[in-house]
């Protein structure tokens, strides 16, 4: 059953899990896309203005490198957000798999903070988010496994 929910034989637009996990997934889509655009569009990519990485103390080349990496990170987040959005509008049976991916991402973000810490002037919002989103992802993954009424679009063939 675990595998059947994560990797259904037929991918459809039917969602049979708890509605809370679905609506929370919608909120995560919005957060992911907005966050990605911030990293891509802010002049510093959010590296100093949000994450408080002291790039103003770096050489011009190092500062440009950090900003470029933040842009690429934003681009990867945008791609993830678009995949989440496609799942939400067309392939809802994959929502449990998306919650698994979401949870794994935040587990590795947390581990990276211990393994390869980044110098910041303050606690970055993402660092706090790791401690919130890991339990949230686990709870939503669990709820997405709970059978409830079928939710689908009229186009779900």
Located regions from the model:
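Cytosolic juxtamembrane helix and N-cap/initiation of the first transmembrane helix
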Residues: 2-35
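Hydrophobic transmembrane helix segments
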Residues: 31-59
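Core segments of alpha-helical transmembrane spans in multipass integral membrane proteins
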Residues: 50-85
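Non-cytosolic membrane-interface motifs at loop->transmembrane helix junctions
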Residues: 51-53, 119-132
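Juxtamembrane helix-break-helix junctions at the cytosolic face
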Residues: 81-96
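Hydrophobic alpha-helical membrane segments
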Residues: 97-114
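Membrane-water interface at the C-terminal end of transmembrane alpha helices
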Residues: 135-154
